[in-house]
Amino acid sequence: MRSEEALKRLHKSVVSCRKCPRLVIYLEEITNRKPKRYQQWDYWGKPLPSFGDPQARLLIVGLAPAAHGGARTGRMFTGDRSGEWLFSALHEAGFSNRPKSDRRDDDLTLSDCYITATIHCAPPKNKPLPQEIENCRPYLLEEFRLLKKVRIILALGQIAFTQTLRSLRLVGYEIPNLPFGHGRLYRVSRREGGKDFLRSDRRADLSTGAVKILATYHPSQQNTQTGRLTRPMFRQIFEKIREEIGEEQ
């Protein structure tokens, strides 16, 4: 319960964050200049907190909220095309109770899965600046500390993959320059004396501070509409996750 309460406090800190002036201005712009199809929406217009199961073994790291997806609805991947792919795959693999989410107040619930992002504000052209990524990094580092049962981290896209590796190094993991590639799975361990955010668990082989990182192409329209990422390819990612963590919690 302590971790759950700490996560709630962290979520409040994220929502109230104003570290990046460019992103604050951009959120105000998209809130005040809604496209016709969303004129009736009351935009969230603030940084988005992470969400999911505090006891999750699967941690998903995305890039950033979509301007007219999460920044509109108030929940990551809710109401956009990437979310349609992600929630469908999570539902099929047993991590979500429903295959689609359009609003933050629907009954979607994640089980054994937690979703976060490299940055928590929608950036212009979906391209965060290096300093904006650094401003947001402490939130991810704190999630690493609080999510004590994580066994596998799924990085959606190359930026999320690169920044996840950087963050793991900062909490004591010995990680070489690993190449990004769809479906590539890496096992990394903390260096001797490094701080481990995972608990010791004989079933999960966490006594050595090991965690697995799985990379995938991001389910963005740029990738899905061009065929770079197909439904079977994305489904196989979650089949691999199930093989790695098993069914039991």
Which stretches of residues belong to each language-model region?
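A polyanion-binding, active-site-adjacent surface
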Residues: 2-182, 195-200, 210-246
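Conserved flavin/dinucleotide-binding core of flavoenzymes
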Residues: 185
